[in-house]
């Protein structure tokens, strides 16, 4: 009888321990299972599964970086390429943010070492998408220049959904829409045309509607001095004589050399016998845009705000 009682107690104890163990395992599994959303983007039309509110993010797109910063999410940034950071993002030079290579040459080993929950890339890293995806869920958030505002807003809203910041994004986009309406009114009132050029080591590229910098025409309402510029990412190669012949009322200048830390060539482009007599130069309407923001960044909540202001201030000079 005594042996039977001891055996019964042992069996009951084993059942209780087993039940507690299963409950503990179940609770742990529940805690570690994260909510996910599916993000459709240019490099994965079926969608990439992304964890909600990721704690560590590696960002290769400066526009997305400034959106995260604008939304108060700078603390989740684990790493970024620091080589040519635009001035307005200089806070991210701090050592608490890891340097993960350059925009064109990522340090995949460093990215993997950080063990991120999410990686955000854009056009300059698109060819490395598969390599990034082996490390962590990777999404492409670059703007489509042919549909600039649509893609810009979509990118911001995507970040809002991932981080539960949808209301904040909505407010920021409303402010941007208001600022765009203001710059368009200014452009319409002036009724002048403009030409966007990029100087690169003495060479010149022009950008028209639907091109990389076409938002100056398509979104901000500045009439193009030349309607026939071929839309492309790198612009249409042009000469000093072309600028003279086109004779724009406003000349918007981006200096690639300055943006990437090399020698500026804007004076060579603007201050020469061919260009000095165009309307824009004679009337003091040459607008030198912040090259790092326009060439390296753009498409973020903060960069878009700055770009609108630059164009509006330039038109009101």
Curated annotation (Swiss-Prot):
Keywords: Cell membrane, Ion transport, Iron, Iron transport, Lipoprotein, Membrane, Palmitate, Signal, Transport. It comes from the Bacteria. Gene3D superfamilies: Nitrogenase molybdenum iron protein domain. A lipid is attached at residue 20 (N-palmitoyl cysteine). It is a lipid-anchor. It holds the Pfam family Peripla_BP_2. InterPro entries: ABC_transptr_periplasmic_BD, Bact_iron-sidero_bind, FatB. Its main location: membrane. One of its GO terms (biological process) is iron coordination entity transport. Disruption phenotype: Disruption mutants are unable to use petrobactin for iron delivery and growth. A lipid is attached at residue 20 (S-diacylglycerol cysteine). It is found in: Cell membrane; Membrane raft. The keyword Membrane applies. Residues 1-19 form the signal peptide. GO terms for cellular component: membrane raft; outer membrane-bounded periplasmic space; plasma membrane. Residues 56-317 form the Fe/B12 periplasmic-binding domain. Part of the ABC transporter complex YclNOPQ involved in uptake of ferric-petrobactin. Petrobactin is a photoreactive 3,4-catecholate siderophore produced by many members of the B.cereus group, including B.anthracis. Binds selectively iron-free and ferric petrobactin and the petrobactin precursor 3,4-dihydroxybenzoic acid (3,4-DHB). Belongs to the bacterial solute-binding protein 8 family. The complex is composed of two ATP-binding proteins (YclP), two transmembrane proteins (YclN and YclO) and a solute-binding protein (YclQ). Interacts with FloT. This is Petrobactin-binding protein YclQ. The gene is yclQ.
């Amino acid at each position: 009888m005594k042996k039977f009682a001891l055996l019964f107690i042992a069996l009951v104890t084993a059942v209780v321990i087993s039940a507690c163990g299963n409950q503990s395992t179940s609770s742990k599994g529940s805690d570690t299972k994260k909510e996910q959303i599916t993000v459709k983007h240019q490099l994965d039309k079926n969608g990439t599964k992304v964890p909600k509110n990721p704690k560590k993010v590696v960002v290769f797109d400066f526009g997305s970086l400034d959106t995260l910063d604008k939304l108060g999410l700078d603390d989740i940034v684990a790493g970024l390429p620091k080589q040519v950071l635009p001035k307005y993002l200089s806070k991210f030079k701090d050592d608490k943010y890891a340097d993960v290579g350059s925009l064109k040459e990522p340090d995949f080993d460093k990215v993997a070492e950080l063990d991120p929950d999410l990686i955000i890339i854009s056009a300059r890293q698109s060819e490395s998408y598969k390599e990034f995806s082996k490390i962590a869920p990777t999404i492409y958030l670059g703007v489509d220049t042919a549909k600039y505002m649509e893609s810009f807003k979509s990118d911001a809203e995507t970040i809002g959904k991932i981080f539960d910041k949808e209301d904040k994004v909505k407010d920021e986009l409303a402010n941007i829409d208001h600022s765009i309406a203001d710059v368009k009114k200014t452009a319409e009132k002036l009724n002048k045309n403009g030409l966007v050029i990029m100087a690169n080591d003495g060479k010149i590229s022009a950008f028209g509607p639907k091109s990389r910098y076409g938002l100056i025409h398509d979104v901000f309402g500045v009439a193009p001095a030349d309607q026939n510029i071929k839309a492309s990412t790198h612009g249409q190669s042009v000469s000093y004589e072309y600028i003279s012949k086109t004779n724009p009322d406003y000349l918007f200048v981006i200096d690639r050399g300055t943006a990437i830390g090399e020698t500026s060539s804007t004076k060579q482009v603007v201050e020469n016998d061919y260009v000095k007599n165009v309307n824009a130069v004679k009337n003091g309407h040459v607008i030198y845009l912040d090259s790092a923001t326009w060439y390296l960044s753009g498409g973020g909540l903060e960069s878009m705000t700055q770009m609108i202001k630059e164009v509006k201030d330039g038109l009101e000079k």
